[in-house]
């Protein structure tokens, strides 16, 4: 796909005079364009849902969720991956973010890294990619060689693959088994795909990881019941989670949390079923960690 023909490289008429307007009008123009992004994502919700189901199936079978991108796209994948362990209590290696150019590229531009097909393949080899894993290639343009080569390699291994881009019919979309293509249109600053395209990618990644965690029993109601209390704020959040899930008071919630080494799920089952920590944990284990199943089936 030629660069000048890509939607993400087009000229936006709404911002054609943005360098001549007041600061407030500048902000309004950007904000008006940003409002279109959730609508673009809404149009691809069936594609996102299909990807979530595949990701969940693979992760349930022992696989991992691997994000692969360059520049802003790579950083967004790393951001999403890094938030999963503290929010949902999963092991750090379950959701992995890879960026062209390696760790240095998280904060710095690495010239030519996104053009390296070998880099995409080698980064996946270095983490021991297997057929159980799901690789999600992220590229606003849909033409990034690092991502395309990584997706091709993943498919050769038998991995399920997802391609996220903002240009229809892109190489990333056609290479991946599942394509998620929110069309956000031309950027306020021509070609600056860190803006609307980046926002769309972030919204999609939010759904992929959150959907995976909900389907994995990491959410009860709308509560993050596997949150790890790594600071004072999260200690308080744990107490509030147990309170909200059970209707108990703060003292009862804290007592239950202390008894089960601050595991929210166990504390919730303890309170709701009037069990000690060991029995509550046993019942959760019997039902794969799903609070809802413990409550509904016993």
Swiss-Prot record:
Any one GO MF annotation of this record: ether hydrolase activity
EC code: 4.2.1.126
SUPFAM superfamilies referenced in this protein's UniProt entry, alphabetically: SIS domain
GO biological process, one term: N-acetylmuramic acid catabolic process
Enzyme class: lyase
Keywords of this entry: Carbohydrate metabolism, Lyase
Catalytic site positions: 83 (proton donor), 114
Pfam families found in the cross-reference section: GKRP-like_C (PF20741), GKRP_SIS_N (PF22645)
Inducing factors: Induced by MurNAc 6-phosphate that releases the repressor MurR from the DNA. Repressed by MurR in the absence of MurNAc 6-phosphate.
Pathway the protein contributes to: Amino-sugar metabolism; 1,6-anhydro-N-acetylmuramate degradation; Amino-sugar metabolism; N-acetylmuramate degradation; Cell wall biogenesis; peptidoglycan recycling
PROSITE patterns named in the record: GCKR, SIS
Reactions catalysed according to its record: N-acetyl-D-muramate 6-phosphate + H2O = N-acetyl-D-glucosamine 6-phosphate + (R)-lactate
Domain SIS per the UniProt entry, residue ranges: 55-218
The protein's assembly and partners: Homodimer.
Additional free-text comment from the UniProt record: A lyase-type mechanism (elimination/hydration) is suggested for the cleavage of the lactyl ether bond of MurNAc 6-phosphate, with the formation of an alpha,beta-unsaturated aldehyde intermediate with (E)-stereochemistry, followed by the syn addition of water to give product.
Family statement: Belongs to the GCKR-like family. MurNAc-6-P etherase subfamily.
General function of this protein: Specifically catalyzes the cleavage of the D-lactyl ether substituent of MurNAc 6-phosphate, producing GlcNAc 6-phosphate and D-lactate. Together with AnmK, is also required for the utilization of anhydro-N-acetylmuramic acid (anhMurNAc) either imported from the medium or derived from its own cell wall murein, and thus plays a role in cell wall recycling.
Name this polypeptide is given: N-acetylmuramic acid 6-phosphate etherase
Organism this protein belongs to: Escherichia coli O7:K1 (strain IAI39 / ExPEC)
């Amino acid at each position: 796909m030629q660069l000048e023909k890509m939607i993400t490289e087009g000229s936006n008429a709404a911002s054609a005079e943005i360098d001549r307007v007041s600061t407030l009008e500048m902000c309004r123009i950007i904000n008006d364009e940003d409002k279109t992004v959730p609508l673009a994502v809404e149009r691809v919700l069936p594609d996102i849902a299909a990807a979530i189901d595949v990701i969940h199936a693979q992760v349930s079978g022992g696989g991992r969720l691997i994000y692969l991108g360059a520049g802003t796209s790579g950083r967004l994948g790393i951001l999403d991956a890094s938030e999963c362990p503290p929010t949902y209590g999963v092991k750090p290696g379950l959701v992995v973010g890879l960026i062209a150019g390696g760790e240095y590229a998280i904060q710095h531009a690495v010239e030519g890294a996104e053009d390296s097909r070998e880099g995409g393949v080698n980064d996946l080899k270095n983490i021991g990619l297997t057929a159980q894993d799901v690789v999600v290639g992220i590229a606003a343009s849909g033409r990034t060689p690092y991502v395309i080569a990584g997706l091709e390699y993943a498919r050769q291994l038998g991995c399920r693959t997802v391609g996220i881009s903002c240009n229809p019919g892109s190489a990333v979309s056609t290479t991946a088994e599942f394509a998620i293509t929110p069309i956000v249109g031309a950027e306020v600053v021509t070609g600056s795909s860190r803006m609307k395209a980046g926002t769309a990618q972030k919204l999609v990644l939010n759904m992929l990881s959150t959907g995976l965690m909900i389907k994995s029993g990491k959410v009860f109601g709308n509560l993050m019941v596997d949150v790890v209390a790594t600071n004072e704020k999260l200690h308080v959040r744990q107490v509030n989670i147990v309170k909200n899930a059970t209707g108990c008071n703060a003292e009862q919630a804290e007592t239950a949390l202390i008894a089960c080494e601050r595991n929210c799920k166990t504390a919730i089952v303890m309170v709701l079923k009037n069990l000690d920590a060991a029995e509550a944990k046993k019942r959760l284990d019997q039902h794969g960690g799903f609070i809802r199943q413990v409550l509904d089936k016993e």
